[in-house]
Amino acid sequence: MSRRCAVRLPGVAALVAAGVLALCTAGGAQAQAPTQARAQSEPAEERPLGQRHLQGPGQGEPQRPRIGLVLSGGGARGFAHIGVLRVLQELRVPVDLVVGTSMGAVVGGAYAAGRSAAELERFARDTDWAAVLADRPSRAAGEFRRREVDLEVPSRIEFGIGPGLSLNAPPAVAGSHALEAALEELLPQGQAQRPAGRLSLGFRAVATDLRTGELVEMSDEPLAVALRASLSVPGLFPPFARDGRLLVDGGLVRNVPVDLARAMGAQVLIVVNVGTSVDHVRDLASPLGVAQQMINLLTEQNAQRSLGELTSVDLLIQPDLEGLDATELATGAQRAIAAGERAARALSSRLEALAIAPQAWASFEQARVQQPLAPGTADTGKLLVRPTGRASAELLAAAAGTTLGQTVDAATARAAADRLYASGDFERVEVQSALLPDGRALILVPVEAPWRRNPLRLGLELQTEQGTREDATRLGLTATTTLRPLNAWGGELRALMRLGSQSTLMGEWWQPLGPGSRVFGVTSWRRDAEAQDIYFDGQRVTQLRVSEATWRLGAGVSLGRSGDVQMGLERSRSRVSPLLRADLASGPIALTTTQAYAQLRVDTLDSIAFPTRGTFVGALWESGGLSGADRGSATLARVLSGFTWGRWAGHVYAEASHASKGSAPLALGGFLRLSGTPISSLYGQTSLFGRMVMGVPLAHMPLGLGGAVRAGLSVELGGAFLPGQSRRLDDLQKAGSAFVSVDTLFGPAYLALGATHRGSRATYVFLGPFW
């Protein structure tokens, strides 16, 4: 059991990103009985390494002071601890116990478990911190059904729909799963499940009980759990639920836990403080920036009290980290490590006084590094999945791409957990080892996230065009939700509504023919309506209101997580009405058709906002009418492929569409569809189009508010042709654009200038899907 602070401390602090939190803000924790006092009753091989090296006179080993290492929290600034450890190892300074908070707990816990400073540096440098700080699974790893929603609503504004239609918002900017996977990868094999207090070095991680504000010492929990709980920075990572408590960053009550190290028996302390000063935060315009400043105010107060407890024999190391933000995990590691090393070397004369002889150091390091596997650690076992309240073990195993009962190793189980997490329904998916009556098992334990249950996604669309013959503005609000699973086979019900210049109402039921079945049936109803400008020779001649209601019934086969193939029947009713006063006498036209369809869709793009990897392929064939003059068909094909070239990235896109009667399914005109021409102003029986888009990153939006800011350009080529018209390359229109793009929470936003080779120009403000 974790030991809580037994003394309630006065004061209540409001924590913006985590809700109201009563905090311990003065005083200290009740002292635990020194671990050295109870060491005499424990077998030597079970005692922490520091205690085994302090047997006292007459036991064959020299007496030396017991050294405690105290590592503060500080986010990316905490990587400075690695530089300090590098110097301690170089000077042969033995550390008998480690107490850490937040990133200090991560670095200190991994060191106590056997990692070297060099291995910790590789972790800081090579970890995909963008994935760790992401608010959801990577798009490329997710299921095709989830990626399909992005094409209609590329927004990241989502809420979970709970009982009584309540809305649940995410509790933090980043998710949990990737962080926990990174921590397990950091720890030596077999140490993630070892109790934090049973390492060869004495170790404690510090967390805060979010409900009570009490300090929580993590000692009996598995090491990976202790590190994860201590690193739960409010607003950045979700609180960690454990034994009925919600645990967050220990820095809120003890960012420099000097008193805990004393209570564990330390006689000399090496304290490394990397906390952010209260006047350092540069971004107070974002919710996360405000939350970070609130945390800084709280941690700075308790840190100063803790530093006041140091004595003349203790060493305080405070690296110069001016200008380094706590959230710069992806870019600040090398700078922080170097700063920590410089600060430690500045005190090398005092550190050398604590050094031990080379032979004693070799023995000390061997015992620290070569630790036995934690009890219950298994390299292989039977794979099981713990069912949730909404999904069976069979359905979850299918989503994880595995089979219940098969024998797997730990890496295979972790890969299955990653695939299950990528379904988008869970906060995290743990891999637990258990000894069952019929043998060892590796169990996938999905932890449901209320903010991902029945997700409601909200979107905003804006397209303004200035400079063409007919300026235009289009605005839309969208909402879509998916209810899943509807049954034991994993059925889904999806709904979409769009209000604005274009109105859409859609409902779809998608039903696999068994748990994990690749074969499915689908039925949908959709109604679209919008005002369309009709152009002739580049000039608007009239405006029509076009509405279409379509019902589909089909079946298909999933292509793994990449796409699907469908075929079936659809029945459509279209209505066209004039909107201009001069055309009202012509009256509306209605048409009802029944036709067969077949479609192929493949989507492995890494991003909808600005694709740089992966491919999108879409092909559709429709044929209707009974025979002769009534028969008609339409086809379209689209291909997009992302690429990178040094710092530049972008995509190449091509499309073609044709109708045996009437207009081709796709019209041209507008931003990135022959930029500089009016929106949807070019149509014919056949349309051809291609473009290349490239951009270079300039900056990055504040964490939690979006992604990269880029400058870029496009080169475009295309045309629409009537029957009998020439379709040579010289007949295609040439266009291009220069733009600044921002990956916002609502999707890709562009400010652009477009032009054609014929001299027409337009400026665009664009937000939403550009397909």
Residue ranges and their predicted role:
Residues 74, 104, 120, 213, ...:
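Buried hydrophobic packing residues in well-ordered domains
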